Amino acid sequence: MFFDASVLVQCTNAQAPDKMGRARSLVAHATLTGSAMVSAAGLADLYQRLVAEQAVPPDRAQALVLACADWQVVPVDSALLRAGMDLAGLFRLPLCDAITVQAAIQAGASTLYADHLQHGQRWGGLTLVNPFLGPAGSR
């Protein structure tokens, strides 16, 4: 279960309780089963979003990010950057999203949870899932 920062940030979004509950449930399940994965770039993005968008105090944001850092974290190296740029060019994705997709593929994830990419899109064995669509939480 690979997480994009767009889903993780919803864990603190009291303005959208359905999304917050769904995100927390996914994170709890992934953490308990040891299947939680994220990229180092995603952790940096999460910190920025928590502080800037959710007004989470920096020390609290750091604690939340470091809790996620205990998961399987995919580092962004030159090979991942190159693969991300190739994917971005091929599919006209923003580079940060392409790096997330490539990190999930590199980690061997079967599911990438993100709320802004095309739900159901597949790249090999990886499927993009918007966890906030459908009965578990509408957009």
What are these regions (language model features)?
Residues 71-113:
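Active-site neighborhoods of divalent-metal-dependent phosphate/nucleic-acid chemistry enzymes
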Residues 39-41, 76, 131:
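Conserved beta-strand termini and adjacent loop/short-helix elements that scaffold enzyme active sites
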Residues 4, 45, 97, 115-116:
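Acidic active-site catalytic centers that drive phospho-/nucleotidyl reactions
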Residues 45-72:
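Active-site-proximal, substrate-binding regions of enzyme catalytic domains
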